[in-house]
From Swiss-Prot:
It comes from the Eukaryota. Its EC number is 3.4.24.-. Disulfide bonds: none annotated. This is Snake venom metalloproteinase BleucMP. Its cofactor is Zn(2+).
Length: 9
């Protein structure tokens, strides 16, 4: 998942 701040989770 790509978060709203641009980090992969």
């Amino acid at each position: 998942t790509l978060t709203s701040f641009g980090e992969w989770r």
